[in-house]
A protein has these predicted regions:
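Conserved strand-to-loop turn within each blade of WD40 beta-propeller repeats
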Residues: 4-7, 59-63, 103-107, 151-154, ...
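Terminal intrinsically disordered, low-complexity extensions flanking WD-repeat/beta-propeller proteins
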Residues: 225-242, 249-252, 258-264, 268-342
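Per-blade loop-tip surfaces of WD-repeat and WD-like beta-propellers in eukaryotic adaptors/scaffolds
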Residues: 12-41, 52-54, 65-100, 106-135, ...
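Loop/turn segments within WD40 beta-propeller blades
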Residues: 48-54, 90-98, 139-146, 198-204, ...
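Long, well-ordered mid-to-C-terminal structural blocks that present hydrophobic/aromatic surfaces
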Residues: 193-221
Length: 342
């Protein structure tokens, strides 16, 4: 597992539980430390493995760079430099015909870096305009390798086809076109900054979160607001918020940082299943490991916690006559709210 810190350091962890104990500590295999000549100068905002080969990974930082790393040597293979602070980047998990890295920066344009041509071409001239403020989150569709979603501080979420000169396919509208274009909130996704987005595993829907404390689910083919109500989803992050969805569960879940906890919702009903408690400072990011049905969360308390599914939950202490755990149907293939986990 890759992790990036606010100090610019990148650490690689071995996730194997060699102890076979229920509670264990993952070992750090190696790191790009403060003394490394190519270490990021400021906070690392995003790290990602090259989707087809773990021999390479990428990182981006507030130091205005995107770096491509050789995993074996921990040396940079390429560096892309930007004029603005970098908030987020993403490589397509399904692309076979391009090696584009989408980058969101403090500028209002979506920027694309081509790993095939390298930094000699710097940043592609195809920079899509359309947003009015900084781009806080970017994500490629897992369904179509040319479709890119972007979220901005201008309250808008856009879907792009990077093959098209005009670029923009859809600007989603929280009102589904039912309000006049003269209304200030027309063609906006949220009533505040949109600082996180995530496609569902099949790519048919897109989830977004905003500083209006709302999460919304969109049809990714036509941009329709599905109007699923998740209630208040606390979000006071000043930068990108990285949340994730489950893969391979009988019901699909979304995991969202919520203060010092992680809120778990069923995607299509909006029901809040549980709150995962274990961190003691704000959670900034979480990622799902589908092979083992595990969730990992990173927090400002300097800890990364691993969460595993639990099919049973403890019986309340006030019932002294009952000693057995009871199966909670809501947690079949799902998640336990036990404070002991993590």
């Amino acid at each position: 597992m890759l992790s990036g810190g606010s100090d610019g350091v990148i650490v690689l962890y071995d996730l194997e539980n060699s102890s076979r104990q229920p509670y264990y500590t993952c070992k750090a295999v190696c790191s790009v430390g403060r003394n490394h000549p190519d270490v990021h100068k400021y906070s690392v905002e995003t790290v990602q493995w090259y989707p087809h080969d773990t021999g390479m990974f990428t990182s981006s930082s507030f130091d205005k760079t995107l770096k491509v790393w050789d995993t074996n040597t921990l040396q940079t293979a390429d560096v892309f430099s930007f004029e603005e602070t970098v908030y987020s980047h993403h490589m397509s998990p399904v692309a076979t015909k391009h090696c584009l890295v989408a980058v969101g920066t403090r500028g209002p344009k979506v920027q694309l870096c081509d790993l095939k041509s390298g930094s000699c071409s710097h940043i592609l001239q195809v920079m899509f305009a359309g947003h009015r403020q900084e781009i806080l989150a970017v994500s490629w569709s897992p369904r179509c390798e040319y479709v890119l979603a972007t979220a901005s501080a201008d309250s808008r979420v856009k879907l792009w086809d990077v093959r098209r000169a005009s670029g923009c396919l859809i600007t989603v509208d929280q009102h589904n076109g039912k309000k006049s274009q003269a209304v200030e909130s027309a063609n906006t996704a949220h009533n505040g900054k949109v600082n996180g987005l995530c496609f569902t595993s099949d790519g048919l829907h897109l989830l977004t979160v905003g500083t209006d404390n709302r999460m919304r689910l969109w049809n990714s083919s036509n941009g329709e607001n599905t109007l699923v109500n998740y209630g208040k989803v606390c979000n006071d992050s000043r930068k990108g918020l990285k949340f994730t969805v489950s893969y391979g569960c009988s019901a699909e879940f979304v995991f969202v940082p919520y203060g010092s906890t992680i809120a778990v919702y069923t995607i299509y009903s909006g029901e809040q299943i549980t709150m995962l408690k274990g961190h003691y400072k704000s959670v900034d990011c979480c990622v799902f490991r589908s092979n083992f049905q595990e969730l990992y969360s990173g927090s400002r308390d300097c800890n990364i916690l691993a969460w595993v599914p639990s099919l049973s939950e403890p019986v309340p202490d006030d019932d002294e006559t009952t000693t057995k755990s009871q199966l909670n149907p809501a947690f079949e293939d799902a998640w336990s709210s036990s404070d002991e986990e993590g």
